[in-house]
A protein has these predicted regions:
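Acidic, serine/threonine- and glycine-rich low-complexity intrinsically disordered segments
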Residues: 183-282
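N-terminal type II signal-anchor transmembrane helix
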Residues: 30-67
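Flexible, membrane-facing loop/turn or short amphipathic-helix motifs
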Residues: 102-110, 137-148, 173-188, 227-240, ...
């Protein structure tokens, strides 16, 4: 005999078990679970709606920031054509796409025509931006056009307090055509620009690095370029192939943009500007150089400075320079004597180098006249 909610168990006697409490418990737990699910779904809908509003506000602020930057540059005399950037990437990123932007400096003394540029940031970290711009970049100056074809062009930019704090650029497959038609090629290049930093090394090139004054602060520049091929038209004495150029330096002194590069450098020099080279490495055929030192500009805006260098292969390099007529026999002889006197067991030599009045000195001996730099 059965009835709703009861079970009859047959045995030595009849027992009646009422299942109504179990059913009520199961129903109560099911309702509680349904309520939890409804609350969670409501919370997710509210959070999703709030995040959607946040993302679109961030996208609007990004577009407004781009417009403000362009307007500020135009007010300073620049010509800026960014087109109508596309802002996409919802929901996981903010992505700005610029189609072939063009920018010209004041008085049109330079002009940059870029390929398509894509900039991406996480909505919750808008100050950390990843930029990609492979393709052909054209920089036009009064001396002519420079074409740079880049198989890979990426950069990571960190912005803090409306100012650029850190930029790391990575290039690969670099082919540069200069105004005279010369081709300069590099397998890869990495460049880092830092904001206010002390004049201390951030890369190790194996060179002796003096301890700088802790008060020396400036604009940090680090560069590492590999497998460079120089233009044949230059007829480089040590060969066209450079294995490596690595630089870690701090530019000390205020750099205030002026009407031209020459005027900008003049202001920087007059304000006591210097370049503290914490580390420099050059691997060029037979020559291996690792050095550090301090440089500035003289009254004619030509480099001058002093450094201590570890050099390997200086005698072979002097022989090539002598054979090419770049230096005379007296300078080559002086370089050999100084190198042998200061070398370590016939290996590398630690030599004092200086640049003054467009001449390179090894110790007190002038060995090479340097062509003047035309900043205009």
């Amino acid at each position: 005999m059965e009835s709703l909610g009861t079970v009859t168990i047959l045995g030595h006697g009849c027992q009646w078990i009422d299942l109504n409490p179990c059913a009520r418990y199961i129903i109560a737990m099911s309702l509680r679970l349904i309520r939890i699910i409804i609350v969670l779904m409501g919370a997710l809908l509210v959070a999703g709606g709030a995040y959607t509003v946040y993302w679109y506000n961030a996208a609007a602020e990004l577009r407004a920031g781009i417009d403000r930057w362009a307007q500020d540059r135009r007010a300073a005399g620049w010509t800026v054509d960014l087109g109508d950037p596309d802002i996409t990437g919802f929901p996981t990123r903010l992505e700005a796409f610029f189609q072939t932007p063009q920018i010209s400096g004041p008085d049109s003394w330079w002009r940059w025509v870029a390929p398509n540029i894509r900039a991406t940031a996480a909505p919750w970290l808008p100050g950390e931006i990843a930029v990609s711009a492979p393709g052909v970049h054209v920089v036009t100056r009064r001396s002519g056009d420079v074409w740079a074809e880049l198989d890979k062009a990426e950069a990571d930019i960190v912005i803090e307090n409306a100012a650029m704090k850190n930029i790391v650029a990575r290039l690969a497959g670099v082919r540069i055509r200069l105004p005279g038609g010369e081709m300069l090629v590099a397998e890869s290049a990495v460049m880092r620009l830092l904001g206010s930093v002390p004049a201390t090394p951030s890369i190790d090139v194996g060179a002796y690095t003096p301890h700088p004054d802790p008060s020396d602060m400036g604009f940090g520049v680090a560069l590492d370029v590999r497998k460079i091929v120089l233009p044949d038209q230059w007829r480089p004495v040590l060969g066209r192939n450079i294995g490596k150029i690595a630089l870690d330096a701090v530019i000390v002194g205020e750099i205030a943009p002026a009407a031209s590069l020459k005027h900008t450098l003049t202001r920087w020099r007059d304000g006591g500007g210097t370049v503290e080279v914490a580390a420099l490495a050059l691997y060029w055929d037979v020559l291996r150089l690792r050095t550090s030192g301090t440089f500035a500009l003289d009254g004619k805006l030509q480099p001058e400075g002093a450094m201590v260098a570890d050099i390997r292969g200086i005698e072979a390099a002097m022989d090539r320079l002598l054979a090419a007529g770049v230096i005379n026999s007296r300078a080559a002889f002086a370089a050999r004597i100084i190198s042998r006197a200061l070398s370590f067991g016939g290996g590398s030599a630690r030599l004092p180098l200086s640049v003054q009045e467009q001449r390179l000195f090894i110790g007190p001996a002038p060995v090479l006249r340097i062509k003047p730099i035309r900043w205009n």
